[in-house]
């Protein structure tokens, strides 16, 4: 595994143009749709219980995001997730705010228990909570953890048999055996609501293109980070950064990712 093989997944996404089915929050739904389009995939935002099983059958990946949670949405997530599992369609779960309230924490645990999730992507506080470690979450943001995020991510990945991605200044991706650190990104990405959700959407597109979910997730986060670095060079603040970020994702090439990727293997 090297920079060239990671960057090549972007090319596969654009060649395959997979459909990425989202059941996500209403705060960032438009951002997630746009970033999915810009990376080269096709989004569909369908949450009605009566159609999700039918819709996910057409998709290359399913992204579940609990950012604006209610019980009807959970029922739709389970219905779509069960159908995705039947068809071997990868599921990316973003457990937004797990650790902040009992509803969010228990919902994330229920989804992990009842579905075979391929990639669990969250901030350090969310992942620590789900790993049984001490994590602090304020609203939907991590407010600190006790211990090494890489170690509790690795333990959780091994226990559940999935890939865990921990977002932060340095992203961590592990399946319990392999461990990848991704150092791409820019602090402006933390000044904008929705960048974590957008990263989950890109992870879904990459998972649809490559069944090695450690590699695909690391490539997705690195590609998003490279675009963020490029966007930060020509913005004046969060609003212009958002527009520049979408533009840079749209313009991003595999060669640019290969030349600018910052990954470490442990």
Swiss-Prot record:
Keywords: ATP-binding, Kinase, Magnesium, Metal-binding, Nucleotide-binding, Thiamine biosynthesis, Transferase. Its EC number is 2.7.1.50. GO terms for molecular function: ATP binding; hydroxyethylthiazole kinase activity; magnesium ion binding. It catalyses: 5-(2-hydroxyethyl)-4-methylthiazole + ATP = 4-methyl-5-(2-phosphooxyethyl)-thiazole + ADP + H(+). Substrate binds at residues 45, 194. Pathway: Cofactor biosynthesis; thiamine diphosphate biosynthesis; 4-methyl-5-(2-phosphoethyl)-thiazole from 5-(2-hydroxyethyl)-4-methylthiazole: step 1/1. ATP binds at residues 121, 167. Belongs to the Thz kinase family. Catalyzes the phosphorylation of the hydroxyl group of 4-methyl-5-beta-hydroxyethylthiazole (THZ). This is Hydroxyethylthiazole kinase.
